[in-house]
């Protein structure tokens, strides 16, 4: 005997309990709330800011660990805190570091996006993630989660594009993206008279 199919779900927009067969949510009016493209795990990330920030931090941490594991012999284990647990340049280049050299010599324009998720040391990763966790909730509160992610991504691309135009040979990190979030928060405060 088969188990009965669950016919209730949370509306992807307002998060109230509704029937999966509803043509539209009776609370918020969202059309076809039971459709698979509106109610899946990937899109669910964009409804919970804490879950999204945890996922974004997890991607940064996972790529950092992967960059360390790609070449364990090139690992920086010195006593200098700025270089402790630092991956080598070849690992970072393989994963998508950007700059004049990767873009001009290897034609990796996609690295303008990927470099925001790579970090040069444990301290670099730690400071970027702490700043992200402090600033992103404010930006999410004022602009919304999707706009915060757009500002973060486009800020990273813009920062790395400026680095490329300035001739920086090799660059990584989420600092440009985090600074874009700071700029968005400052703009919001200034435009509201703060």
What is each PLM-predicted segment?
Residues 1-4:
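Short, intrinsically disordered linker segments that flank or connect zinc-binding domains
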Residues 6-20, 26-194:
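A detector for small-residue-rich transmembrane helices and their helix-helix packing motifs
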């Amino acid at each position: 005997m088969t188990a009965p199919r669950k016919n209730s779900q949370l509306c992807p927009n307002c998060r109230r309990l509704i029937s999966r067969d509803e043509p539209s949510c009776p609370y918020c009016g969202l059309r076809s709330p039971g459709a698979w493209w509106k109610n899946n795990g990937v899109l669910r990330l964009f409804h919970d800011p804490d879950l999204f920030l945890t996922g974004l931090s997890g991607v940064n941490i996972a790529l950092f660990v992967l960059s360390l594991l790609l070449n364990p012999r090139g690992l920086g284990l010195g006593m200098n805190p700025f270089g402790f647990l630092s991956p080598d340049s070849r690992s970072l280049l393989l994963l998508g570091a950007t700059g004049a050299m990767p873009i001009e010599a290897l034609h990796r324009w996609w690295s303008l996006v990927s470099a925001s998720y790579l970090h040069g040391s444990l301290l670099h990763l730690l400071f970027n993630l702490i700043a992200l966790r402090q600033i992103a909730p404010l930006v999410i509160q004022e602009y919304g989660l999707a706009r915060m992610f757009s500002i973060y991504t486009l800020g990273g691309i813009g920062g790395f594009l400026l680095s490329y135009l300035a001739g920086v040979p090799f660059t990584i990190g989420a600092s440009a993206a985090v600074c874009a979030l700071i700029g968005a928060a400052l703009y919001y405060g200034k435009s509201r008279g703060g």
